[in-house]
Amino acid sequence: MKHTAFLLLLVLLLGITSCKKEYIYRYGVDDLTATNNSAQKGKLKTPEQYIAILHINLYNIPMSSNDMYRLGQVYQSIGDKEVAQEQILSNFMNDDNPDSYAHQKGYVVVKPTNAQMRSNIEDFITDTYNRFYLRYPTQAELEWWRQYLNAHTNVTPEMVFFSFAISNEYQYY
């Protein structure tokens, strides 16, 4: 009888303590879309890739193979990679100069006006990062650009595009 009472008490205690409600913990964490960052860019663009990608980023249209060949020859003939890129970029951005490539082809750089940029700096910077770097800006980058553009009212969209196109990150894919 003692054993039966003891076993009954033991089973009862185990039954009571083992049947606990399982709690589901939920935390207020927002979903976040993961995107590539610049740390994964490790391959240097060839001169032809740089020119072709720059052309598409500025005009939203691909470059003809003849123009690609000619500009590739110009790029190679200059010798200094950075000087060559700055010269080609200046020529592309100078769409109102009659001697420029853009003017001769009838191309216009697709960019917002200064007023449009100033009216929504955050969207402008996000769009520019997506356009040139194929990624979203970090919060620190976004804040830096916001403060910089608010403090320097003489900076235009052309200047921002120029700085993105000659940056080290833009050299890689």
Feature map (PLM): residue ranges:
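Composition-driven recognition of low-complexity segments enriched
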Residues: 19-173
